A protein has these predicted regions:
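Macromolecular interaction modules
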Residues: 1-143
């Protein structure tokens, strides 16, 4: 995909060591626009309303939004955006309390999940298009 990148939260804590994996992980979300929503409304709800909610309710140390300009192959799925979320600790992959920035605080975790899901429902139709999520190793290479 050809994308326009917006780095909403740049990592200040992850080590920049070429060829070395960080102690964290990346989660990639591949987004489709709900058919009932026009593009400008979708983009506004994702980039203007949701961004800070995502940063505030998850333990991310890096958050990048990529709006897809066009697919580079005919076979590419019809995604409209790719989100990159960087987590400093790989345990966030398996522990929702860490993922939702609520280590040891169940009430905070539940509140953060609720805020996140309410925000996501403004630009994701989970019944029409389930969001594809991919967890992967994280390597930070200095730009």
């Amino acid at each position: 995909y050809l994308v326009t990148e917006s780095e909403q939260l740049e990592s200040k804590t992850l080590p920049v060591t070429p060829l070395d994996r960080t102690p964290g992980f990346d989660q990639i979300a591949l987004l489709k626009k709900p058919s009932h929503q026009d593009y400008d409304d979708w983009l506004f709800k994702w980039q203007s309303l949701h961004t800070q909610v995502a940063i505030d309710t998850q333990s991310t140390c890096r958050y990048t939004q990529n709006v897809i300009v066009r697919a580079l192959t005919k076979e590419a799925p019809d995604y409209v955006a790719i989100v990159e979320e960087g987590y400093p600790d790989k345990s966030a992959m398996f522990d929702p309390m860490i993922f939702y920035d609520a280590k040891g605080d169940k009430d905070r975790m539940l509140k953060n999940i609720q805020l996140m899901m309410e925000s996501c429902s403004g630009f994701i139709d989970f019944e029409e298009f389930p969001t594809d999520l991919i967890a992967m190793s994280q390597y930070i290479v200095k730009k």
